[in-house]
């Protein structure tokens, strides 16, 4: 399989991929969830493993990852552990154990894309980058701010930092307080998509940020998140509604 997430140039509106999260806490819940979500035919499936209550049992996680792959209907799987500091669920395993878990799922070919936080220690980032390259796993370096929206320059700098660290994709998610914040995020997205050599994924969260999830592709964001069952972040729309909005944008903005 080629790289699931491809670059857009930011100068021409393009339809973003749709990624749907999987947030089940048990193996049975995840299998039920992926069967329902895959039927909606998103472009990617994101397993938020920090929601999984057995994250501390490596063999259990690997077995579940294998089952998810078998039930994915060929849809690429994005593997994500989101830390508490960036909006994730509390877990009982160390950062070193998380890194080892990422290594295992990549080496066993159980996932297609991994999300690693920019704040991850340099040595661990370097280690995961090498394994991602070795296993041809696409890797995202991400930054999430659930408190505010940084300046346009700071958002752009985070995406540039992702590229400088060898990421295949850069991702930034922020929390807006005003519509001006949403526009700041979208302007930074357009600049990043126009100047970086890697794909970028951006979104503003919450109700205000929904606009960025619908129209982010017009500014160069390569992917947006939508829910089929349960949300993994504030502001995510149902996949059917989002797809309808993207169809309208395609028809009247991109001319597709």
From Swiss-Prot:
Signal peptide positions (record): none
Catalytic reaction(s) noted: 3-dehydroquinate = 3-dehydroshikimate + H2O
Protein keywords: Amino-acid biosynthesis, Aromatic amino acid biosynthesis, Lyase, Schiff base
InterPro entries attached to this UniProt entry: Aldolase_TIM, DHquinase_I, Type-I_3-dehydroquinase
Enzyme Commission number: 4.2.1.10
Pathway field: Metabolic intermediate biosynthesis; chorismate biosynthesis; chorismate from D-erythrose 4-phosphate and phosphoenolpyruvate: step 3/7
List of residues binding 3-dehydroquinate: 46-48, 82, 213, 232, 236
Active site: 144, 171
GO molecular function, a single term: 3-dehydroquinate dehydratase activity
Assembly and interaction partners: Homodimer.
Main function: Involved in the third step of the chorismate pathway, which leads to the biosynthesis of aromatic amino acids. Catalyzes the cis-dehydration of 3-dehydroquinate (DHQ) and introduces the first double bond of the aromatic ring to yield 3-dehydroshikimate.
Protein name: 3-dehydroquinate dehydratase
Organism field: Shouchella clausii (strain KSM-K16)
